A protein has these predicted regions:
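ATP-dependent carboxylate-amine ligase catalytic core
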Residues: 28-29, 33-36, 62-148, 164-166, ...
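Short, intrinsically disordered, charge-balanced linker/junction segments flanking boundaries
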Residues: 264-270
């Protein structure tokens, strides 16, 4: 048992066990970990995951929903990985859950990411939130977050990352990322590579999933402009954020109604 949250975090961050996705799945089943969350948005991709998660979260919160986010890595402190309505898990809750799960963690020698995943699952289940945005750690197909049943899959883009685990070609990497798409779960992406999009389309067809490939407006002059629902929005943001915002807008529009004022407010506050 840990007496302080600093002791607990030091312990969490020192755990580096390597384990297959299948073995982690067996642990989930053996200990009956609560993996059923409602309205799960699963986000994978090489770049832009963090910004896309933030845009989706802010848009949903503008509609009055309570939103949990699971992200990595953290910027300032470990707590940020598990947040509700933009507020990181408290010291007391983090300490409570790590002590509650400590026998399991020590018995199974869980890694840091596995520990955080379990804490997130117990914490979010306790709160009964409206939406949950879950960001993959590495890849998608074998990422430990893929034990969760999602309602929407999101892939920002495909680039060369973690090649020692995901493969040396873009298609091999795409295969891992698109692995978050489950039966009848729609996929949204702003990937523009035609070969990768064709691969995504075939994968979605096999899994009876609707595929939403999104076009991103080319920007040549600052400030940038984005057209959505027959309205133009002015963006005082870096050009790469146009893609992330386009993705977030379409995902949230699929889930609930959006209005112009809320969209502009999120853009202005980012």
């Amino acid at each position: 048992m840990f007496k302080t949250v600093d002791e607990a975090i030091h312990f969490i961050e020192s755990q580096r066990t390597k384990r297959s996705f299948e073995d982690f799945q067996k642990i989930i089943e053996r200990y009956q970990i609560p993996i059923d969350l409602k309205n799960v948005i699963h986000v994978a991709g090489t770049n832009g995951k963090g910004s896309t998660v933030t845009f989706i979260k802010d848009l949903l919160m503008k509609q009055g929903y309570h939103v949990g986010t699971f992200t990595s890595p953290y910027i300032i402190k470990h707590h940020e990985r598990i947040s509700v309505d933009g507020k990181p898990i408290s010291d007391d809750d983090l300490l409570r859950f790590i002590n509650q799960l400590l026998p399991l963690i020590q018995q199974e020698h869980l890694s840091m990411f596995e520990i955080d995943t379990l804490i997130m699952l117990y914490y979010f289940n306790e709160l009964d939130l409206d939406y949950h945005i879950i960001e993959c750690g590495i890849g998608g197909l074998h990422d430990k977050t893929n034990v969760i049943k999602s309602n929407v899959a999101v892939i920002t883009n495909i680039g060369y990352d973690h090649q020692f685990m995901l493969g040396d070609t873009l298609l091999e990497i795409a295969h891992h990322k698109v692995g978050i798409v489950k039966e009848n779960v729609p996929l949204f992406t702003t990937e523009q590579n035609k070969e990768i999009l064709s691969y995504f389309k075939d994968y979605c067809t096999k899994h009876q999933s609707t595929f939403y490939p999104l076009q991103v407006e080319k920007q040549y002059q600052y400030p940038y402009h984005l057209h959505f629902h027959q309205k133009e929005y002015v963006l005082h943001l870096p050009t790469y954020q146009v893609s992330n915002l386009t993705l977030a807008l379409n995902v949230v529009d699929y889930l609930c109604d959006l209005n112009d004022e809320d969209i502009q407010a999120v853009i202005d506050d980012f």
